[in-house]
Amino acid sequence: MTTNPNQRESLTAISQRRLQAVKSKSIYVLPNAFTAAALFSAFYGIIAAMNSDFLSAAIAVFFSMLFDGMDGRVARLTHTQSEFGVQMDSLADGVSFGIAPGLIVYEYTLKGLGKLGWAIAFVYALCALLRLARFNCNVGVVSKNYFQGLPSPAAAALVCGFVWLCVEGHLPDFAQPYTSEIAAVVTLYAGLTMVSNAPFFSGKSYAVVKTIPFWVIAVGTLLFIVISSNTSLSIFVLFCLYALSGYAYGFYCYWTGRPNPIQADIARSLAQQQAEQAEGDVH
């Protein structure tokens, strides 16, 4: 049995489409694999905390941050963004930056505060989930230049950074008897700041440039040296500064009379919705 040229071309086209479908499915696995890796790191951190290996537990959450920062970039680079990936990433973030840090800090030191300790850990986890839900609802409302409230990865870094700091013995001697109380304050601050309207710089407005100024290289090198010399202390201090920056910028806007970018975006969105509703009522 022989096939004519038209049939051969048709079979070739079908084969190419099937091959393209297989490639597409394999590429879609790539960004979700990073999301799964972030979730695995957080799960490992929980298991490590249950086994009193708090150093590994804290560092595991930072690995979750690393993988979480890569999945979206990989999806954009490979043009494989999907609604499934968005939802999976959000659910994984809830575990990685909400549940895991709350359990780790509770097992490490908040347990000593009794019921108050687990209540604080729960408030943190709840605030992280509320933060993620609000972020999903406000896509397209709030400018990408700012985060509305402290991002959940930064909050997790603040909480787990404190655990890491304490495990390595960098907490001052006079503060060590109050480790549980300090952890409670840090955890509550991180949780409540996530659901605040404080504007935090996202860094998404900076485009990739071909040339880098010398001062940027110098500052980057200095930061690398400082972090390398005392990783846990440097990371905790950096995230403390970032966690305070949103309130500082909000106060600056209030003091100078400039509009708060988050409040301005929300007001603009509400005005647009009211205008569209009014236009619909007219028609």
Language-model regions: role of each:
Residues 1-19, 144-283:
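C-terminal membrane-associated helical module and adjoining short loops/tails
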Residues 1-69, 249, 283:
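Topogenic membrane-insertion module of multi-pass membrane proteins
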Residues 73-82, 129-144, 149, 195-204:
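C-terminal ends of transmembrane helices
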Residues 34-37, 57-64, 120-127, 155, ...:
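Hydrophobic alpha-helical transmembrane segments of polytopic
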Residues 28-35, 77-132, 162:
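Multi-pass membrane catalytic core of lipid/isoprenoid biosynthesis enzymes
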Residues 43-46, 63, 101, 126-129, ...:
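Alpha-helical transmembrane segments of polytopic integral membrane proteins
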Residues 44-59, 99-119, 162-182, 228-233:
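Helix-coil boundary and interhelical linker segments in multi-pass alpha-helical membrane proteins
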Residues 23-34, 41-54, 59, 112-139, ...:
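"…together with the soluble PPM/PP2C metallo-phosphatase catalytic core" -> "…together
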